[in-house]
């Protein structure tokens, strides 16, 4: 039955990197562990995660690809700079509703999946305007 255990992927979505290290070490390091906090991907990568699952990868994957490539090349300054951009974006998402803001961003880049489901609500026009201005200021979507 070991082959069944090998098929499982485990998602770790906690900001506690000490606990992440403990999980990485479980089963002699043989777990397939995915990290679920986009704004801390580089830190988790340095600890040895196997991959990542996150919402901002849907619309900001080029940034994360560049960040991981820089990290693998040993260009920590570039990787850190790109990770800070992710941190800034996640911070903006958390100022409003992360899911509503993510839907807004997806629509902005051409993927309109409709409004969020109840009990969530879409951004109000004033929230949308402020959010768009903040996103423009980050200069992530050119």
Model segments located where?
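Homeobox/homeodomain signature
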Residues: 5, 31, 110-113
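Ligand/cofactor pocket segment of small-molecule handling proteins
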Residues: 9-47
